[in-house]
Amino acid sequence: MKKVIIWTVAVLNIILIFMMLAVGYSGYLNPLSHPMWASLGLFFPLFLLANVCFVAFWCIFRWRMLWIPVLGFLLCFPPLRLYFPLNPPSSPPEGSIKVLSYNVMGFDSRHMEENEVNQIAEYVVESDADIVCLQESGKWGKWGQRIDSMLQARYPHYVATPHPGKSPDHLSVYSRFPVLSSEMIPFESNQNFSMAYVLNVNGERVLVVNNHLESNKLSYDDKDSFDLMTRGKLSNYSAKHETKHIFDKLAEALKKRAPQADAVAAYIKNYRDKGMSVIVCGDFNDSPLSYTHRKVCDGLTDCYVSSGNGPGFTYHQSRIYVRIDNIFCSDDWKPYACKVDTKVAQSDHYPVVCWLKKQPKR
């Protein structure tokens, strides 16, 4: 009987590994053709956790079978490193520039009180970043002028762009370096968009791309239901219904984001083919294992994967934890000490910070 149990568990472990591989490499599927399968990368940590449980089981009951989950981790090393990088500590060398990417959720200005200092704007100013890319940077009512004054007093060069349609979304760049030009990257979306800026960074033209790609459009009710579901406070029927509802929304958003990612990637490649240095920031609304991440990061370095540690969750509302905000750079930059800064929680996103050091031309 014990032998039957051992072999049954071994088969289950092998099945799990195949599923973990399918989920870990789901970003190679085009969401236009396989929207459901392409969204499975969000569930990768659940499969990792299950494989860790198998490690514990084999350590206790049959250590010679430990090779099965270990092999699974080895086969999934590329997506595992994307999702959960580990790097030695690195101090930014002299001459590095500091880059900040932050979805500020309208600076949370709806909830500001009279004479209150906006904590998000204060954080941006005190970050002392050289280049700041903000998403959802539109301000509400009378607080806008006060926030603008704080930011513009620190940053002499800035461009704030509203969405060309009816969306309230704004994208902004604040910089210590001159902004030579700016333009919108053309792709279809009713609510989201991407901006490209050419900056003069210490005498060199650098393309900076600021993205806010298609939202998953989860309503407050959706997020509240997900919160209740993760706490075990929904019935089985309600949980199944809500899971399908959320999954359908994720798949639909993926189908819209895929051509946006293609457009941004093509735009960046055009500049890279001309030899221009590139820094990419933004809220991608997609996981590190997604088609979106893979396409936009193609030929670039993910600064968090290269120099950060841990899962680095940037979205943190309603018990939804995922890294959807990124900083990428071309290979003429070396990233240092990239981190998700959890000190400021007024937005539903945490900011991402990284130091970049220009590398000598090869």
Language-model-derived ranges and their functions:
Residues 95, 127, 153, 177, ...:
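Structured loop/turn residues at beta-strand edges in well-structured enzyme cores
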